[in-house]
Amino acid sequence: MQSSMLLRVRALPKTASVLSRTKTATYATYKVPRIDNEPNKHYAAGSPDRKALQEALARTQRNAPLSVPLVIAGKEVKSSSSLTQSNPASHGPVATYSNATAKDVQAAIESALEARKSWASTPFADRASVFLKAADLISTKYRYDVMALTMHGQGKNAWQAEIDSAAELCDFFRFGVKYAEDLYAQQPVHHAPGVWNRVEYRPLEGFVYAISPFNFTAIGGNLAGAPALMGNVVVWKPSPSAIASNWLVHQILLEAGLPKNVIQFVPGEAEEVTKTVLDHPDFAALHFTGSTNVFRNLYGQISTRVAAGKYRSYPRIVGETGGKNFHLIHKSADIRNAAVQTVRGAFEYQGQKCSATSRVYVASSIADSFLEQVASEAKSLKVGPPSDFTNFCGPVIHEASFTKLAKVIDEAKNDPELELLAGGSYDSSKGWYIQPTVYRTTNPDHPLLTRELFGPILVVYAYPDATEADFARIAQKIDATGEYGLTGSVFAQDREALAVANDVLRNAAGNFYINCKSTGAVVGQQPFGGARASGTNDKAGSGNLLSRFVSLRSIKEEFVPTYKVAYPSNEA
């Protein structure tokens, strides 16, 4: 089944008329291709896909470090200073990249603003085609290259790179087109006699600032791509730990036909780039994924400037940040399923997903069996470089993360409320490696049950379960513990228990899972995001997110003229 889309078409010859001088002269109904999720490849031993990916990994390694410039005014710019993105599995260089100065950022902003009028008036059919083409390029020509850069640069194994930099990135671009089509189709449903009412979804007046994280290549593409799809111009600052893959995504968009100055690519020191952006009066929106503390700081900086009347418009602020995501396991749960899902949720990509499982509350009556399986599975996970396909876990992203997590492990050795069940070791001799670590705590208020760690450390508490009231109480404890509200899962076969958890935990997670892990949201299936300290919950992978990057204009046109000033009620 295909769906209709209202598209602006260049149909009139160029004359002196106003209509013919724009790209919005006529309207026609089109149909976009059917949108489906990108099929996953599995990279089994001996498969052609594994061979192709291994070749891309070897080629990327031979060509390292990749030299990444700034892209300003459609031109590649080498700055006077450069920085290095390191491979977290080896400490070797993945890319050297230009470090944007305040002057560079100012030039990027001005270039973006110059492109705004042309891009904003480009028919949606043309804008949509860029992103559909980019998705096809990622799916085919560049699939293994973008995966290889993600694996080398961000420490993901083959499967994690596949579901991120290949599949999810394609899904963001394709479903974005579908959601934009649906948004544009939302028009007034009633028209008085002789009146035509309509709504125009205008791009924001100014530019969008996209700050992307290290942990998902797809998020980088979406943070810059979603506003651009809606006709906005973007200044994109990628994470210093994801430069190589993000650079390739930008190049793919250009190859797909994106005008070169619509998205400005400006890697650099966060403080200097951000200050220059936020000081500009045409700053129109922030699109952010990263830490809660950084987002709060940015929110405050923007608010201060709003209070001072700095901006032309009130900036939109869209952010997805951290989480302290839970698994709640009822005594009726399938224990094996709960254990396997917990190990996957906690240790896939070394626990560096904002949705990663980091705290578990399990019924005491099944705790021993559950913990035995979790500990056994955690101990069996192979840890090492992603280029070895047998490794389930790779390195954590950088030295700062490694140091923080190693300190947690060291401090836990002297904590009487923690029992080490698996892991508890680390190694930085070649790469930043933390063994998958599981603790059992006797304290339901232990700090490790509230503090976001962003690494492969899982803490489990066994709660009393003599009565069903105990289950409701532990659900209330989860809801009241910690400041986040991103993801969470409940495991139970008892439907009444599921109903209790669903009700009590209604605000504890923006993505709530039943009998499955707290990670793995799929574009087009589970829109992603949370509230509380986890962000603005605008739901990546949904039409709601796109609505944040348009400014509506209501238009009323009357076809019947009015010739009398007085109303009937004014008559004598």
UniProtKB/Swiss-Prot annotation:
PROSITE patterns: ALDEHYDE_DEHYDR_CYS, ALDEHYDE_DEHYDR_GLU. It is found in: Mitochondrion matrix. One of its GO terms (cellular component) is mitochondrial matrix. It comes from the Eukaryota. Its EC number is 1.2.1.88. Keywords: Mitochondrion, NAD, Oxidoreductase, Proline metabolism, Transit peptide. Gene3D superfamilies: Aldehyde Dehydrogenase, Chain A, domain 1, Aldehyde Dehydrogenase, Chain A, domain 2. Pathway: Amino-acid degradation; L-proline degradation into L-glutamate; L-glutamate from L-proline: step 2/2. It catalyses: L-glutamate 5-semialdehyde + NAD(+) + H2O = L-glutamate + NADH + 2 H(+). Pfam families: Aldedh. It is an enzyme of class 1 (oxidoreductase). The active site is at 320 (proton acceptor), 354 (nucleophile). NAD(+) binds at residues 300-305. The record marks 215 as: Transition state stabilizer. CDD domains: ALDH_F4-17_P5CDH. One of its GO terms (biological process) is cellular response to amino acid starvation. One of its GO terms (molecular function) is 1-pyrroline-5-carboxylate dehydrogenase activity. SUPFAM superfamilies: ALDH-like. InterPro entries: Ald_DH/histidinol_DH (IPR016161), Ald_DH_C (IPR016163), Ald_DH_CS_CYS (IPR016160), Ald_DH_CS_GLU (IPR029510), Ald_DH_N (IPR016162), Aldehyde_DH_dom (IPR015590), P5CDH/ALDH4A1 (IPR005931), Proline_metab_enzyme (IPR050485). Belongs to the aldehyde dehydrogenase family. This is Delta-1-pyrroline-5-carboxylate dehydrogenase, mitochondrial.
